[in-house]
UniProtKB/Swiss-Prot annotation:
This is UPF0758 protein BCE_4545. It comes from Bacillus cereus (strain ATCC 10987 / NRS 248). CDD domains: MPN_DUF2466. One of its GO terms (biological process) is proteolysis. It holds the Pfam family UPF0758_N. GO terms for molecular function: metal ion binding; metallopeptidase activity. A motif (JAMM motif) lies at residues 174-187. PROSITE patterns: MPN, UPF0758. Zn(2+) binds at residues 174, 176, 187. Keywords: Hydrolase, Metal-binding, Metalloprotease, Protease, Zinc.
Length: 225
């Protein structure tokens, strides 16, 4: 058969994508499509294999920095920026799926909304979701990055954004990079402090969710709110 089917070979992932769809391609082939070309020493698929091996698969690759990518022989600034832009677009698309009038009715809803974004983070991120009177997410904000400590989490930073967004309530989240979402004493102290401040100013802190690896803990369900 003449035409595009005649040129579909192992080294031509773009042609396979056109014929069979993106879903039929392996991770190495999809990465090769983004990279477009290899180097003088290796094909684009071999370069894809090297990148995936360097980052131990997609889990670490999705958070790769420019410096980490260009340290790999065959990956220049142009290829690295293409990959970083593609990964960021993917994150934003996933986020849009949930941001469109996403309502939070339970701790499970909240954990589902943020799990994939937070469970792989290598540092603790303290994030607040700001809700309207219908419990719909109207804004989210990363308040700080680092170990959770009551002397670091300033209520004014948490509630300042609530006033700016005219939020009716707040849900706080942070991740445990260890994968174990069991709350620490500091987690509980920070939560109680924020809840008390919320009572005083009239913006309820509905929950504090701790994200682990496919696991979460609700401090409200644990009786700390």
């Amino acid at each position: 058969m003449n035409g595009i089917r005649d040129v579909v070979k192992e080294e031509q992932p773009r042609e396979r994508l056109l014929l069979e769809g993106a879903g039929s391609l392996s991770n190495r082939e999809l990465l090769a499509v983004l990279l477009r070309t290899g180097s003088k020493e290796e094909t684009v698929l071999k370069l894809s294999d090297k990148i995936l091996h360097h980052f131990d698969g997609l889990r670490m690759l999705k958070d790769a920095t420019l410096e980490e990518l260009v340290s790999i022989h065959g990956v220049g600034v142009a290829k690295a920026t293409q990959l970083i832009a593609a990964f960021e677009l993917g994150r934003r698309m996933v986020r849009l799926e949930y941001q469109n009038r996403y309502s939070i009715r339970s701790p499970e809803d909240c954990a589902t909304y943020m799990m994939e974004e937070m469970r792989f983070l290598q540092q603790e991120h303290f994030v607040c979701l700001y809700l309207n009177t219908k419990n719909q997410v109207i804004h989210r904000q990363t308040i700080f990055i680092g170990s959770l400590n009551s002397s670091i989490v300033h209520p004014r930073e948490v509630f300042k954004e609530a006033f700016r967004r005219a939020a009716a309530s707040i849900i706080c989240l942070h991740n445990h990079p260890s994968g174990d979402p069991a709350p620490s004493r500091e987690d509980i102290e920070v939560t109680k402090r924020l809840v008390e401040c919320g009572r005083i100013i009239g913006i309820e802190v509905l929950d504090h969710i701790i994200i682990g690896d496919h696991k979460f803990v609700s401090l409200k369900e644990k009786g700390h709110i």
